[in-house]
Curated annotation (Swiss-Prot):
CC annotations in GO: plasma membrane
Membrane topology per record: Multi-pass membrane protein
InterPro entries in the record: AI-2E-like
Highest taxon of source: Archaea
Keyword terms, alphabetized: Cell membrane, Membrane, Transmembrane, Transmembrane helix, Transport
Transmembrane regions listed in the UniProt entry: 13-33, 61-81, 138-158, 191-211, 234-254, 259-279, 293-313
Organism classification: Archaea, Methanobacteriati, Methanobacteriota, Methanomada group, Methanococci
Family classification: Belongs to the autoinducer-2 exporter (AI-2E) (TC 2.A.86) family.
Disulfide-bond pairs as recorded: none
Localization, UniProt: Cell membrane
Keyword Protein transport listed: no
Pfam families: AI-2E_transport
The protein's name: Putative transport protein MJ1177
Length: 334
């Protein structure tokens, strides 16, 4: 075999292996996306810790500091949601339930009672359904736990060894395109920092600040209102102001003017002015600011299309395209 022929065979083998690798990791593409997202979100904390600790300790501490508040807020929200469900007053809908049951009894129940085989059949099918659903949920929970563990490990390694990824990618690029790839990766890094640090991290900070404010005022279900405020803060036009202004109006309507004024001032200072004019400029560069339409696509359309994985995959895709546009067409550097 001549050298030229061997080169084509080698390239074919490499392409085949890459396709096989893609096939293996495709079911876990959401794990990779979330790991990348969490790594960027924890990057500011990692950079601060890196001044005093080595890479391994800094990455571990950054993950702990960043993920613990998220887990705490999520657990609070779930417990609050369960409390709302358990405290639901069923007496208000009892007349409707009784009416439905009476109609059902008059048409169906007498025929079913007269046929014991039908009763046994329905009971058997119901038990099989419960068993299949329960076993399926156990498998789903186990699968989810495995994915969460994988996200934690991959986030750790992305933080610790992320700087090596750039050199690894450039090493696969032909020499004449290495400089352009270097420029594009720089834009990509800034674009992801803007999306994940500016948008997502800012949303988490607003969630925590709003939770503190709602607790001080004694707002019922403060955890849920704080999470809603953080989610609204992600979206253009809407914003977290819709939540705290509504709460202020509520206090005003019940003649609790002190709380209404406090909610308005606290919301304006800590949930609007401070995030936009103090925290956001500190986190990201203005030159790579993301257009509001792209934010909607990344954080609203992508989750609606792809499910929960869209919260991570959407920003990754939008960030990559935005970086290409900025480098290629706006600044004409590649």
């Amino acid at each position: 075999m001549r050298f030229e022929e061997f080169k084509y065979v080698r390239k074919g083998v490499i392409v085949g292996l890459l396709i096989m690798l893609l096939y293996i990791i495709w079911p876990f593409i959401d794990v990779l996306a979330y790991s990348c997202a969490f790594a960027y979100m924890a990057l500011p904390v990692y950079n601060i810790l890196r001044k005093k600790f080595n890479k391994t300790i800094s990455a571990g501490l950054a993950i702990s500091i960043y993920i613990l508040p998220i887990m705490t807020i999520t657990i609070y929200a779930l417990l609050t949601f369960m409390e709302i469900i358990l405290s639901f007053n069923t007496k208000s809908i009892e007349p409707y339930i009784n009416e439905i049951l009476s109609i059902y009894n008059s048409f169906m129940l007498e025929r079913i009672i007269n046929n014991e085989q039908i009763i046994a059949k329905y009971i058997d099918e119901f038990i099989k359904y419960l068993v299949s659903q329960f076993s399926g949920k156990i498998i789903d929970v186990g699968y989810l736990i495995v994915k969460v563990i994988m996200v934690l490990f991959l986030t750790f390694y992305f933080l610790r060894d992320g700087d090596k990824a750039k050199n690894l990618i450039i090493s696969f690029v032909p020499d004449e395109y290495k400089e352009k790839m270097r420029i594009y990766l720089s834009y990509l890094h800034d674009s992801y920092k803007n999306l994940f640090i500016s948008c997502v991290s800012l949303s988490i900070i607003i969630t925590i600040l709003s939770y503190i404010g709602y607790l001080i005022l004694g707002v019922p279900y403060a955890e849920l209102f704080a999470i809603i405020t953080g989610i609204f803060a992600l979206l253009p036009i809407l914003g977290g102001w819709m939540v705290y202004i509504s709460i202020a109006i509520y206090f005003f309507l019940i003649h609790d003017y002190t709380k209404a004024v406090f909610m308005f001032i606290y919301g304006e200072l800590f949930l609007s002015i401070a995030p936009d004019f103090v925290i956001r400029p500190y986190l990201v560069k203005k030159e790579v600011d993301i257009h509001p339409v792209l934010v909607v696509i990344a954080f609203l359309m992508a989750p609606l299309s792809l499910g929960l994985s869209g919260f991570a995959i959407g920003p990754l895709v939008v960030g990559a395209l935005n970086a290409f546009y900025l480098a290629k067409y706006r600044d004409k550097k590649i």
